[in-house]
Design a protein with these regions (language model features):
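The feature marks the mature, well-folded catalytic cores of soluble enzymes
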Residues: 1-179
């Protein structure tokens, strides 16, 4: 984690604080009735705490991504056995496609896929094909400023989006109430 990729310019993370925050996060999820699987730390992949980038969960399937950051691609192989124990229907994004889960936002049965430094059009098109095979839909949203789609926008249910920066006026989100 200390050697992870960062664009925030905040310096090195405080490892002990991050461990406490992670434990609190797991406890909060468990208090909501969720079953949490905690994987052992892997020094080879310092960004592996961000599991959303390596796998996108669908209602009855999972899409294993192909991260745009080369240093993260091995994480997909590491998390696959854990997901295989939970989900039968597994698809993978293939080269030349790249896709990271931070660029994927689910709104009901539709998925918005950000085209970013980490997710390209080939990866987004593959994801849309997989979504359609599962009875879901997807569309692409070009990013100009943010690292990931969800760096600047989050769906908070009931037609509401929490948006920041370039996402406030995106035509793709005009049907939502922007907060």
């Amino acid at each position: 984690m200390i050697d992870g990729i960062s664009t925030a310019g905040l310096g090195l993370p405080d490892y002990d604080l991050a461990c406490r925050q992670h434990a609190d996060y797991v406890a909060a999820l468990e208090n909501c009735g969720l079953v949490v699987t905690v994987l052992p730390p892997d020094q080879e992949f310092p960004d592996s705490t961000f599991v959303e980038d390596t796998a996108v969960m669908l209602p009855n399937a999972v899409i294993l991504t192909r991260p745009g950051a080369l240093s993260r691609r091995g994480e997909v192989l590491e998390i696959r056995p854990t997901l295989e124990a939970l989900v039968e229907n597994i698809s993978m994004i293939q080269s030349p496609g790249t896709l990271e889960g931070g660029d994927v936002m689910m709104v009901d049965t539709h998925f918005y896929i950000g085209l970013s430094e980490r997710t390209n059009e080939a990866g987004a098109r593959q994801m849309i094909t997989i979504l359609e095979s599962c009875g879901l839909t997807g569309s692409m949203v070009a990013l100009d400023e943010m690292l990931h789609l969800k760096s600047g926008v989050s769906y908070i249910e009931s037609g509401n989006l929490l948006a920041y920066g370039e996402f406030i006026d995106k035509p793709e989100f005009k049907q939502f109430d922007i907060l």
